[in-house]
């Protein structure tokens, strides 16, 4: 009897130990989380800051060692150096926000010494990663594999989360027209797939709202050719606002500065991107400039993935996958991975309210409203006249 009791007690003691392990036997306490910034800092009020805050909150709450590392400069080599530094320091979950980490993943994912490290990349698409396997000609077109024995792939120690940008772009365009704006602009950074999806979604949303209101809308459309603002881009924005553009969706890193500078001078408006940019834009350029922001759920994607890997032990569900995140809840818009902000969007009674937004999200979730993610051609529209101006640089 005593022997049986001892066996039962021993088995019971194993239960919490097993619960703290993932499927490979790694215990929660064995994990250390590092975040590498792309080329900004954790105060950028965008990708880096949001990812940092999600990592820190999760790790603090679960008593997990966490540190962030900032590369010395904006290059793949400098980002790889920080990844290596973090791993040398014992960090075995590496979180990397932004498409700029595609080259980093390409260089580290197949290293034998990193096979047990888990790389979590946000907004690194299949296009971004697989493009690194190729040589390119002077036009940027692919010109054959760098190594014929190393074909494009994603390794089992990598998970990438990407987003349905066309959906939150649609929401932003729909909201802008519903709020009464009929002269719009889209200023993209570089014409990479994510930015194009934002832009084409914006066009589709504006057209849908214009149809409902039986209005005609004009929309200027251009790419800056870079992810930062400068005098040349600001000059184009000055021209747009000067000729009647009311609000510009500035989509691409720091390129919003050119739109916001021009908007401030002309009394115009802007729409932010990726995160709720109202605080940073309004804080620098004037209260009320930001109409809304087309947001990606960087925070929940980071937090949820860390929980799934560390607490739930479900890395096998993520390993070697590139997963596209979008709408997951038709009843609570704040739980989705793509959305516009409830707090800072300039909702207006009789035009576009929080209830109107909730209905839009519900209809999108239920499939009553569909949005194309085709990036090969400008969407077909009926009530929006698009002036596609190509690119500035």
Where do the PLM segments sit?
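Short, low-complexity disordered leader/linker segments with a strong preference
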Residues: 1-32, 389-393
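A residue-level marker of the well-folded mature domains of exported/periplasmic proteins
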Residues: 25-393
């Amino acid at each position: 009897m005593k022997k049986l009791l001892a066996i039962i007690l021993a088995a019971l003691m194993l239960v919490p130990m097993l619960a703290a392990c993932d499927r490979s036997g790694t215990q929660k306490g064995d994990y250390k989380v590092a975040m590498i910034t792309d080329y900004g800092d954790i105060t950028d009020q965008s990708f880096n800051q949001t990812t940092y805050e999600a990592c820190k909150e999760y790790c603090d709450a679960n008593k997990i060692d966490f540190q962030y590392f900032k590369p010395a400069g904006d290059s793949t080599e400098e980002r790889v150096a920080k990844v290596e530094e973090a791993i040398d320091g014992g960090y075995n979950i590496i979180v990397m926000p932004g498409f700029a980490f595609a080259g980093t993943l390409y260089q580290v994912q197949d290293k034998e010494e990193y096979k047990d490290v888990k790389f979590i990349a946000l907004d690194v698409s299949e296009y971004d990663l697989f493009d690194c396997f190729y040589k390119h000609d002077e036009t940027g077109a692919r010109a054959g594999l760098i190594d014929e024995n190393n074909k494009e792939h994603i390794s089992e120690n990598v998970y990438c989360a990407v987003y349905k940008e066309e959906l939150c772009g649609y929401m932003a365009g729909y909201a802008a027209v519903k709020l009464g704006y009929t002269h719009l602009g889209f200023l993209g950074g570089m014409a990479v797939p994510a930015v194009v999806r934002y832009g084409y979604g914006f066009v589709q949303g504006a057209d849908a709202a214009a149809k409902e209101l039986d209005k005609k809308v004009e929309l200027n459309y251009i790419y800056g050719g870079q992810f930062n603002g400068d005098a040349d881009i600001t000059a184009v924005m000055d021209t747009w606002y000067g000729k009647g553009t009311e609000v510009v969706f500035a989509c691409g890193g720091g390129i919003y500065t050119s739109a916001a500078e021009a908007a401030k001078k002309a009394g115009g408006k802007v729409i932010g991107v990726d995160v709720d940019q109202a605080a940073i834009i309004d804080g620098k350029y004037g209260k009320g400039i930001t109409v809304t922001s087309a947001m990606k759920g960087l925070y929940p994607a980071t937090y949820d993935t860390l929980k799934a890997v560390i607490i739930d032990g479900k890395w096998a569900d993520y390993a070697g996958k590139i997963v596209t995140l979008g709408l997951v809840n038709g009843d609570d818009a704040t739980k989705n991975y793509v959305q516009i902000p409830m707090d800072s969007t300039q909702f207006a009674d009789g035009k576009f309210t929080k209830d109107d937004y909730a209905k839009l999200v519900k209809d999108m979730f239920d499939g009553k409203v569909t949005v194309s993610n085709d990036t090969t051609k400008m969407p077909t529209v009926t009530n929006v006249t698009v002036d596609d101006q190509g690119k500035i640089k």
